[in-house]
Amino acid sequence: MENFIFHTELKSELNFLIENSHKLDGVLCFHGLAGCGKTTFAKYYSHLVSKEVHLYDASSHLFDKGSASNILKQINETGRSLSEFTDGGKYNADAFWNHCFIIDEWSNLSASRQNAYKVTLERVSKEMNALFILIINTSKECKIDKVLTSAILSRCQTVDFDIKAEHIDEVTELVKERYSMLDEEYIRKTLPDMRQIAKRAKLLS
């Protein structure tokens, strides 16, 4: 967790999820602006709490070849189909969850495709002891209830990764400590896009 630059409130929430992953119902949704660390943390978290991690990208060609229901059939066929999607195989043998399915760019799915998952998310989670992490981009103009259908939203425990106005000062100081080559004006102008900040720091290092 020390490798992430998150404000105290978010870090506390994420630590709680790490310590209590066994209490989750089976579907998490990480949301916020692009570049704020949702996908990177999802990968880190999934390796901690599950035996196998499987990463999907809803914007890739894999999701264009068939309907959402066909993709879910592939998820069900873990032994035969998931090997081509897994990001490296088995991890934590002592983890509570047998599988973690990360679906990045979930917000690219239409409402009808999202709703095709609503029953299967629950069923697969129970039958396979699987955790799903849905990752979506949200903003002030496009909030989570505008991105997720009500059926999917009601099945998710949501985590907001956004850096709000009250967090800017704290996060700015954390970034300055991590990337001393960056000036404060640039940091404040670029937040909350931590991806761009990291790229700039790498360029100047």
Indicate where each model-derived feature is located.
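Pre-Walker A (pre-P-loop) alpha-helix and adjacent loop at the N terminus of AAA/AAA+ ATPase modules
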Residues: 1-33, 74-77
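Conserved RecA-like P-loop NTPase ATPase core
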Residues: 4, 14, 30, 39-42, ...
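Conserved phosphate/pyrophosphate-binding and hydrolysis machinery centered on Walker-type P-loop NTPases
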Residues: 4-8, 35, 187-194
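Generic alpha-helix structural propensity
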Residues: 9, 37-40, 112
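Non-catalytic interfacial helical region
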Residues: 16, 52-205
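Walker A/P-loop
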Residues: 19, 25-60
